[in-house]
Amino acid sequence: MPTVALEHPEAGPRSASPARGRAYWACTLFVALTALGAGVMDILHLQPLFGLLLHLGYPPYFATLLGGWKILGAIVLLAPRYPLVKEWAYAGMIIDYSSAVVSHWACGDAATALVGPMVSIAALVGSWYLRPQPRRLPRSIV
């Protein structure tokens, strides 16, 4: 007797596997909690992040602006629905972390200063790649 697949046609292979779901949430929680903590530190101008921004040549008000966007991005990644807003959050965080890598490199910082933003980029890409179907844009938009 033939079997009938009950998966959504756009879901892709093994989209609902438990391991994939756990990996998605591990990456997403890492990114969201890191962004939330860094956002609070930026808004409150707390060390070491505030001193680091000044060292990289950014003005003090930039920390407040960046912190607000980090907090909003973390909330959006954790909230259900709104896949288009999530795509913007992912894009903003990629810009933030890749800018951190370039800023450290341009200031002549040690290679170890690049590790944190690069780990965040890897977790962010993992979160984006592993996100479940309800958190993705419909194929008609992409």
Regions found by a protein language model. Name each.
Residues 2-142:
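Membrane-interface extramembranous regions
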